[in-house]
Amino acid sequence: GTYYLVFSQGERQFKVPYEIAARAEGSVARRSFTTADMIYLLMPDRFANSDASNDSTPHTRERADRSAFFGRHGGDLQGMIDHLDYIAGLGATAVWPTPLLLDDEPEGSYHGYACGDYYRIDPRFGSNELYREFVGKAHDHGLKVIMDIVTNHCGTGHWWMKDLPFRDWIHQFPEYTGTNVCFS
């Protein structure tokens, strides 16, 4: 049904409708991946390029540059589709591509972990429609698909990064500050 999110500030209120759709029939019976699966993890940009026409697009900032170590190299969904026989032939039962969602950072985001739009496949990989085709063909090969979506961080280009509710909503340092801890 439709529910309303109610936002208020002092005496002012506004409501936003939010629909919760019914589950698709049989979705509760859907099987997930388990310890019995052999999962093939792949980084789409580095895996296989079957459509050079989408390596660089007019609506994304970083251009393909195979000579750049941290640059985009052009792998795409069509390359993944074209190699499903190979993946299944290895004995894999599931395929896990790193994030395929739009990641339009100016550089170094070929890995997909700086999402800018959680609803759209990055056009350098293909389209939402091609993603659905990939999933269907993977299922035809007996492969489950794990969609990698990281919701606890996003790219600097995501709209909510440009409209933070408070300046200290996220950690902001005057210069680059390494925050990862490495153990050897």
Which residues are covered by each model-predicted region?
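Substrate-binding/active-site clefts of carbohydrate-active enzymes
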Residues: 47-184
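Compositionally biased low-complexity segments at domain edges in trafficked proteins
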Residues: 29-55
